[in-house]
Structures are given as structure tokens and as C-alpha cells.
Amino acid sequence: MKKIAALFILIALSVSAYSQSDNWFFSFSMGGSLPLGTFVKTDIDNKESGYAKNGFTLLLDATYPVSNHWGLKGMALVNTNPVDRNWLGTKLETRMNAVPISVADADREFLSLKVNSWMWNALLAGPVFTMNFDRVFWDLQVLGGMNVAYLPQQKLQYEKPSNNWYYLDRNTTTTNVSYGLSAGTAFRFPVTDRINLRVGVDYYRSNAKVQYEQVRVTNQGATTLTEKLGSGSANIPIEMISGTIGFVYYLN
């Protein structure tokens, strides 16, 4: 988040070097995000299922008007969505059983699952069209740019103390960089001469490549043997709609 914010500020400062700086306005908004499509699916037979649950979105943007209706906008987006642990765990157990490694009901206490949330940062830019209704502004925008996804670090481990081995299913990648596209709309309501209330809805789409491996690690006294049992990858579409509320500040 800090790197995206720093890059966003750098771009804003670079553009303002040859623009009329007093025309800029900035906004800060936050709210909820609702995953869509296969990103929200929990189908263990679909490689593109994202197991994403409702999450949180934060937006920071800067706009430079070039006419009464058109402007150029840069946006930094931060989003996070928790993962449905129950269905993801079912998927990983099914994959383990196919090795095959099966866990008896009496041994399930030795089976553990760790997973964190989906999270991504995006740096976007594009045109914005504005309509003015007696001091109330309606913005329509289409933005594109870079998306950096921090992948859920899912790990299923079966480790029974009486065995001289343990099984591990884990991600082999932590981040993925791809293209992101956003289409959104927002209303700006006057509060003071320089401050507006902003209420917006945005659709966002990108994708992330997740890679994993399945291994069995055997203790052979002073050494350990790591046996690769399987591996694979999946391109998961990231798709969500967010509703946010925040404030706009005008330099002039």
C-alpha cells in the first residue's frame, strides 16, 4: 500500500509540474467490495474459483479538469477480500486424497489449514466525464493500469507425530502482476467551498496466476528427503464491485 501511494503521489507531482496546479482536486474514499463471477465461486472442480468473500476497498485519486466536462484521473486502489476457509480446505483435501494420501477421522487433529486474504493494489489512470447539476457533480470514468495481487498463502499440512514424514500443499508464488480495468461513477455533493462529499460505485476486473506444489517430506535421520507429489497453476479472474464514500478536496 505504501509503495502504491508513493508512486501515485510521484505521478501527481510530475503532472502538476506542467499543469495549472490550482485546478486539481483530490479524493479519499473507502467502503465495501462485493466479489463477482468465478472470483466468488466455491466450486472445487473449477480451477478458476476464487473462494472470495465480501471485503474492503480504499480509493485515493487525483483529477485534473481539461474542460468543463472532461478530465484526467489517476487512482490508487487497495482491496482485500477474505477467503472461504471451509470450501478452500475441502478443495485442498480433495487434492491430497488424489495423491493418494488419506486421513482417518481419528487423525484429523494432525491436519491443519492456514490461509490469508486476497489483497491487491492497483495504479490506474484514464479519462473522466463530468456533468454538473447545480453544484452537484456526476462523474463517469474508465481507468486502466497495473494490478499487483498478493496471493492467499494457502497451506494444508498433515503431520502425525508417529509418522516419519509429513504432507504439505502450498503456494509457490506470493505475488502476481497483471493489467487492471475499472469503470465507475460517483456523485460529489458540496459541503464547503473546497470540500465535497463523494459517493461512488466502481467495477473492477483483473486476474492472478496462482501456482502450487504438493510435497512429502521424510525424516531420514540426519537428513530429510523432499518428494514432489504434484504441482499446478490456475489463472483466477479477479472481479468485484465496490461502494465507497469519502471526501473531495479542491485546491482552488
Residue ranges, per PLM feature:
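Extracellular/periplasm-exposed beta-strand and loop segments of Gram-negative cell-envelope proteins
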Residues: 35-53, 80-121, 147-178, 206-242
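Substrate-binding/catalytic groove segments of enzymes
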Residues: 192-198, 207-212
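Sec-dependent N-terminal signal peptides
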Residues: 4-13
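Positively charged n-region of N-terminal signal peptides that target proteins for export
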Residues: 1-4, 20
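Sec/Tat signal peptide C-region and signal peptidase I cleavage site
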Residues: 13-19
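Repeated loop/turn-to-beta-strand initiation elements of outer-membrane beta-barrel proteins
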Residues: 69-72, 135-137, 194-197
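Residues on the lipid-exposed face of transmembrane beta-strands in outer-membrane beta-barrel proteins
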Residues: 28-32, 58-64, 124-131, 142-148, ...
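Short glycine/proline- and aromatic-enriched beta-strand/turn motifs that initiate or cap beta-hairpins
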Residues: 19-65, 71, 235-252
